[in-house]
């Protein structure tokens, strides 16, 4: 890998990896990931993707091995706390939180157990893959406990007699329910985030990073927005504009053959619900279209 190329570490496998690859493709990056390759070169930008384990990404950033990384905040904070405790470098810069990879680290207990608050965890043995995050939360609460560190299948620890409770990642809660557990306390909320190593970048790399950030912003904003078009009676235009959600002042254009109506175009940052569309129609609006946006730049 040339030091002149921007090096970005991403997760090798899993949902976070797929969503990250999709984001980069929407940003205009061309690459082909196949087989067991650990380094993938972009075909149209001076960028190399490193495909690694998710828990290696924070250290690669903190040690200055790569320039950027996409990582879940839970893994990032776990490694940061661990390295800080060991006196190792733990600095990085967060460039932006992304719109995928959402989850939460929660303490779960037996489904039949009554839970009145964190104080009920005093003296418990808690199984987890995230001992640093768990310790940070419990220390803040001033609650004594012991840790059972596991690298997988944490949810079976209570049934196996290894622990009284667990601290594990939760998305829907279905896995907890299947193992006779219930969520008791959320201790950390996480999303994917783009981070950068400390230190200076040359002008070309800095410009490329800024370009990527601008494109990411456009992709994420486009994903959250809709393009709305409709025909509106001129005498009801103000009332119709009041109904349109999360929008700047719309573009209003005359129709070629109908002087009583105008065309209204706008970008909305909120969903247009069926109820709103029905209200628009009741005011005389017609030809109402709600379209996805692929890219946008302000």
From Swiss-Prot:
Q: How is its activity regulated?
A: Feedback inhibited by histidine.
* Enzyme Commission (EC) number: 2.4.2.17
PROSITE patterns from the entry?
ATP_P_PHORIBOSYLTR
The protein's required cofactor(s) are namely: Mg(2+)
Is-annotated flag, keyword NADP?
no
Quick one: a GO cellular component term? cytoplasm
- List the Pfam families hit by this protein, alphabetically: HisG, HisG_C
Q: Which UniProt keywords apply?
A: Amino-acid biosynthesis, ATP-binding, Cytoplasm, Glycosyltransferase, Histidine biosynthesis, Magnesium, Metal-binding, Nucleotide-binding, Transferase
Q: What class of enzyme is it?
A: transferase
| Classification via InterPro entries | ATP-PRT_HisG_long, ATP_PRibTrfase_cat, ATP_PRibTrfase_CS, ATP_PRibTrfase_HisG, HisG_C, N-reg_PII-like_a/b, N-reg_PII/ATP_PRibTrfase_C
Localization recorded for this chain is: Cytoplasm
Reactions mediated catalytically: 1-(5-phospho-beta-D-ribosyl)-ATP + diphosphate = 5-phospho-alpha-D-ribose 1-diphosphate + ATP
**Disulfide-linked positions:** none
What function does the entry list?
Answer: Catalyzes the condensation of ATP and 5-phosphoribose 1-diphosphate to form N'-(5'-phosphoribosyl)-ATP (PR-ATP). Has a crucial role in the pathway because the rate of histidine biosynthesis seems to be controlled primarily by regulation of HisG enzymatic activity.
Q: Which family does it belong to?
A: Belongs to the ATP phosphoribosyltransferase family. Long subfamily.
Supply the name of the protein: ATP phosphoribosyltransferase
Q: Which organism is it from?
A: Aliivibrio fischeri (strain MJ11) (Vibrio fischeri)
**What gene is this protein translated from?**
hisG
């Amino acid at each position: 890998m040339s030091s002149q190329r921007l090096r970005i570490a991403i997760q090798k496998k899993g949902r976070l990896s797929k969503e990250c690859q999709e984001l980069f493709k929407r940003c205009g990056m061309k690459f082909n990931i196949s087989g067991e390759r650990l380094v993938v070169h972009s075909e149209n930008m001076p960028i190399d993707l490193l495909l690694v384990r998710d828990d290696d990404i924070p250290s690669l950033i903190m040690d200055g091995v790569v320039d950027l990384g996409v990582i879940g905040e839970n893994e990032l904070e776990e490694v940061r706390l661990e390295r800080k405790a060991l006196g190792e470098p733990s600095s990085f810069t967060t460039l932006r939180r992304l719109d995928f990879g959402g989850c939460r680290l929660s303490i779960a207990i037996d489904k039949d157990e009554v839970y009145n608050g964190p104080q009920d965890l005093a003296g418990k043995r808690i199984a987890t893959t995230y001992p640093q995050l768990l310790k940070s939360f419990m220390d803040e609460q001033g609650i004594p406990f012991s840790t059972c560190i596991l690298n997988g299948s944490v949810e079976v620890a209570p049934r196996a007699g290894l622990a009284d409770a667990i601290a594990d990642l939760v998305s829907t809660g279905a896995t907890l329910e299947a193992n006779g557990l219930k969520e008791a306390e959320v201790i950390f909320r996480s999303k994917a985030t783009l981070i950068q190593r400390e230190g200076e970048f040359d002008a070309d790399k800095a410009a490329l990073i800024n370009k990527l950030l601008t494109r990411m912003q456009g992709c994420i904003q486009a994903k959250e927005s809709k393009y709305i078009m409709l025909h509106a009676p001129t005498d009801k235009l103000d009332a119709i504009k009041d109904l349109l959600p999360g929008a700047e002042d719309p573009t209003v254009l005359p129709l070629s053959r109908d002087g009583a109506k105008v065309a209204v175009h706008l970008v909305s940052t909120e969903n247009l619900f069926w109820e709103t569309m029905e209200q628009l129609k009741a005011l005389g609006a017609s030809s109402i279209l709600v379209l996805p946006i692929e890219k946008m730049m302000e």
